[in-house]
């Protein structure tokens, strides 16, 4: 009997009905799947019936068990199994996969946000279905005006639609986690940057992330006050007036398109200011 290791954030899901619901939610056109944290291999087994799968397991003991359990699938090329930290592998040349892939995972809660953000930024990742803490799931899947709407919600919705599919009862895990878990799905339909992308290049995308960090720095304060720490307040007030936005708006009350528009205007204002300064 394998015991879950706390330092790896392990909670093994073995409920067949829940595992089947995850498989059924994967888009029909997916060919390659990347799985992070296969654990005992219950989800891996189901994935391998349909998809070529690449799995990353950080726990060496579990890796050895999986290597034996799926020896045939590894031999015939249906499964690529690595004993590696997926977060570290993301930073390596080639990332998690040399091909386009769909991410499916029961993510450790302590690294879930970081992993989802990596997947969002990874151009080879076509989307994801992951199980995470419900509190985090709500932040990624929230819509404008929801109290949970955040910078994470905006980043998740830029390329497609992020939705919370269903909750998973703690008693379906071994050991049971102390929090409710939820499964979210993100299917990308747009490119983040490039010729047909939302942003011109990676530098502009990073600037937008910094803009969002400023916007949501203090969720209880007004958006105008938050942004004023990084941008000229008078210029912002003019932007708000031209867009018919109330100056007492809280960060969660503005929609994604309006955030993009304010960012674009402030970026253009900054570029004009730099050009004027270079001419003096």
From Swiss-Prot:
Superkingdom of source: Bacteria
Principal subcellular localisation of the protein: cytoplasm
Record-linked InterPro entries: KsgA/Erm, rRNA_Ade_diMease-like_C, rRNA_Ade_methylase_Trfase_N, rRNA_adenine_dimethylase, SAM-dependent_MTases_sf
Name assigned to this protein: Ribosomal RNA small subunit methyltransferase A
Keyword check for Cytoplasm: yes
Name of the encoding gene: rsmA
Reactions catalysed, as given in the entry: adenosine(1518)/adenosine(1519) in 16S rRNA + 4 S-adenosyl-L-methionine = N(6)-dimethyladenosine(1518)/N(6)-dimethyladenosine(1519) in 16S rRNA + 4 S-adenosyl-L-homocysteine + 4 H(+)
Keyword terms, alphabetized: Cytoplasm, Methyltransferase, RNA-binding, rRNA processing, S-adenosyl-L-methionine, Transferase
PROSITE patterns registered for this protein in UniProt: SAM_RNA_A_N6_MT
A single cellular component GO annotation: cytosol
Entry keyword Cytoplasm: yes
Record-listed S-adenosyl-L-methionine binding positions: 11, 13, 37, 57, 85, 106
GO MF, any single term: RNA binding
Function: Specifically dimethylates two adjacent adenosines (A1518 and A1519) in the loop of a conserved hairpin near the 3'-end of 16S rRNA in the 30S particle. May play a critical role in biogenesis of 30S subunits.
Family: Belongs to the class I-like SAM-binding methyltransferase superfamily. rRNA adenine N(6)-methyltransferase family. RsmA subfamily.
EC class (word): transferase
Places the protein is found: Cytoplasm
Matching PANTHER family: DIMETHYLADENOSINE TRANSFERASE, DIMETHYLADENOSINE TRANSFERASE-RELATED
Any single Pfam family the record assigns to this protein: RrnaAD
EC numbers for this chain: 2.1.1.182
